[in-house]
Amino acid sequence: MNKRKYVIFILLCMTTWLQAQDSVKTFDEFFVTGMKKIEGVFPVYVAEKEVYLEIPREYIGREIEVRGQIDRGFDLLNRPVTGLGVVRIMSPDKATICFQKPFYTERILDEKSVYQRSFSLSNIQPAGDSYPVVAYSKEQGAIIRITKYLINGNDWFSYNHGFIRSLVPELSEVTKIHPFEGGVSFTVRRYHGVEAERYMFSSSAIILPEGSIPLEVTCVVHLLPQKKDQIRLADHRIPYQTLTFKDYSQDPYCMVEDSLILRWDMSKPLTFYVDTLFPKEYFQVVKEGILVWNTAFRKAGIRDALQVKYADSKIIPAEQRAFVSYDLMMPGIKSDFTWHPRTGEILSCRVNIGHGFQKGKLDDYLLSCGASDPRIIADRYAKEVEKELLQNEITGEIGHLLGLRGNLSKNSCGTTVKVGEDACRAIYFGYNPLKGSRNCYDEREQLRRWIDKNLPDGTHSLPPSDYAAKVSNLQIILNQLDKIVYKGGKRDKGSSLTDIYRKAIRQYGSYLMGIAETVGSSQPADAQHQAMLELDNYLFHPVEKMECTYVKENLLEARNNILYPELVKMFKHLLSIETISALRLQALHSNQKGYSDDDFFRDLYKGLFDDFDPSAAVSYEQMDIQLICLDAWLDIIQENAKHNSTTKRLKDELHSLYNRLEKLSTIHPQAEVRDMYTLLMGRIK
C-alpha cells in the first residue's frame, strides 16, 4: 500500500513539473503584435499594460539590488522607501526564476578553510521568492512578468505614511522605463486615497475621481558588479555601524561572534547629486557640509572622495548612489541608506531636508549659545545662523551615511562643524586602502596595531564636564527670554514664550543629568566630587533660581511641573544599582584613592541636606528636592530586591539617613522643616 502511495506521489510531481514546462511559451508565441522591447542590461518587454523583465542567462547566480523611492506626490520629493534589497538570481528549473535572500548570520570568512565545503552543504539557503518563466528570448534569457510588483504590490518596494491612504490599483500605470549602465528603472504612477479635508487648501493637490491623488514612484533593478568581497572587520574602539555574525573559521572548536563595518566602495568618487528644486540659498551650505569630510578622506589616502553636483534634467534621482532633496511635507533632516547584507558595502543613500527643518533648532541654539552669540539675541531667526545650523546638521548626517556611529564632528557656538581627529581616525580605519593584507583577519590585525599606536590615552574617558558653563549661559538667556521673544513690544497671550520656556527648563534638567552622569563613571575622583559640588551650586543651593520672571509673574507656566520629572530621572541615575555598584568597585580597585560610595553619600548629604546642620535654613524647594530624592531611593530598593549586596548598601544608608532626620525633626528651628522630616521618616518606615 505504501509503495502504491509513493508511486502516485511521484506521478503527481512529474505531472506538475510537465505542466510547468508546458506553461513556458516559445518566444514567437510570447512576442505578440504591438509588443515593444527596450534593450539594456535587463531587456524589458511591454505589451499594452503588461511589463516583462528578461533575465539574461549569464546573470543566473549574480546579485541584484531592488530598491525604490517616492519621486513626487503628497508634497514629497525623492523620499526613500523600503525595497526588496539585495537578492541572488537563481533558476531551480526551466520554468522558474527565484530571487534568493541568503542569510549571513553564520559564515566561514576564511575562503581557504577546510570546513568550507561541509559548511556550504549543511548551511542550506532558502529558495526565495519565485517567479514563473513566461518565455525564453532568442538569447535564452528567462522572461518573467513583473506588472503586479510595480503596479500594486508591496514585494519589491513599500512605503508606510499615515497621510497616504489605500492604493487604487486600477488607476495605476507604468509611465517610464529607463535602462541605464547598471540596470533598469521603472517609474510608476500610483493612485492613493486621500483625506480630502487635509488638502482642501493645498495648491499641490488635485482631487481626482473617488478622492485619489497620484504618487510617482520609481523602482530600480541594479545588477551588482562581480568583485571580491571587500569586508572590513570591526574594532570596538572605532565607532562604526556594524553587521554581527557568527564565524566558524576563527576557532576550530566553536563559533566566534564577530562584526563587520558598513562602508562605501570608494574605488571611485561618491557624488551627491542635489535636486534641481533644492533652494539655491541653501545649496552652498549643504555642499560645504558634505565636502568637509574630504579632509578626513585625504588623511586616509583618498583624494576627492566626496563630490557635490546639481542634478540636471538627464539625471534620474532614483538611479543615483547619493541624492539630496528638499520637500514640504515632513519637517526636519532625515537620511537613509541601503547596504549589502553580506559585505556591509553601502550601496545608496538619500538625504531629505523637509521644509521647516530649522523648527526647534534655532530655539535650541538660542538657549545653548545665545549668551555668547549676539546674532541670535538680535534676531531669533537670523538667516546666517540658520545656514550654519543646516551645514552642521548635514555634516552630522553625512558621517552617519559614511557608516560612522555617533556624531564625531565637533563645533562650538558661532562656528560650523569641523571634522575632528576622532572622525579622521574613524575614516582612516574604515576607508584606508591597506596594502599587503592577505585577508580580512590580517587586515584587522594591521589596523589594530595602528589603533594601539594612534589612539590617545584617555579616549574612553568622558571629556571634562562643561555643563556648569552651559547652566550659567542658560541662566543668562532665561533672565531676558521675554525680551528676546517679544522683541519690538509685540506680545501674544504667552504661547510663543511658553513653548521656548518649557524647552529651557527641560534643557536645564538635561544639563543637571549630564553633571550627574559623571558620578560612577570612569572620570577621576576629583571630577566626580566636582560634579556633586556643581549639583549643589546649580540645584540644591543656587545663587540665582533658574526662572523667567515674566513667565512667573504672569502665571504662564509652572516651572516645577516641568523640572521635577527631570529630577526624578536624575536621582534614579545617581542612586541606581549600576551607579552605586560602580562607586563601590572604584573604592576597591583604587586603594581608597577613587571616588567611593561613602564619598558620594557624604557629598549628597552635605549639599542636599546641609550636612544635617540644624542651623541651616531650608527652602521649600529644597524640601521638595529632598522628597524627590527619597522617593527615587525607595523606588530603586523596591525594584531591585534581587541585587542583595548593593541593595543592602542602599538600605543601610537609608537607615542612617533616618536616624539623622529623626534628630533634626525635633531640634530644627523651622517648624515646616520638622514636619517635612517627620514625613520623610514615615516614608522610610
Label for each model-derived stretch:
Residues 22-278, 296, 311-361, 365-386, ...:
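Auxiliary tRNA-acceptor-end handling modules of aminoacyl-tRNA synthetases
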Residues 11-19:
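Hydrophobic h-region of N-terminal signal peptides that target proteins for export
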Residues 279-286, 290, 383-391, 501:
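Solvent-exposed, acidic/flexible segments
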Residues 24-25, 310-333, 388-435:
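The catalytic-center signature of Zn2+-dependent metalloproteases
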Residues 3-10:
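Sec-dependent signal peptide recognition
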Residues 60-61, 279-305:
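Zn2+-dependent metallopeptidase catalytic core
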Residues 284-291, 295, 392, 396, ...:
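Solvent-exposed, polar/charged alpha-helical surfaces in well-ordered, non-transmembrane soluble domains
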Residues 411-685:
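Conserved catalytic/binding loops enriched for acidic/polar residues
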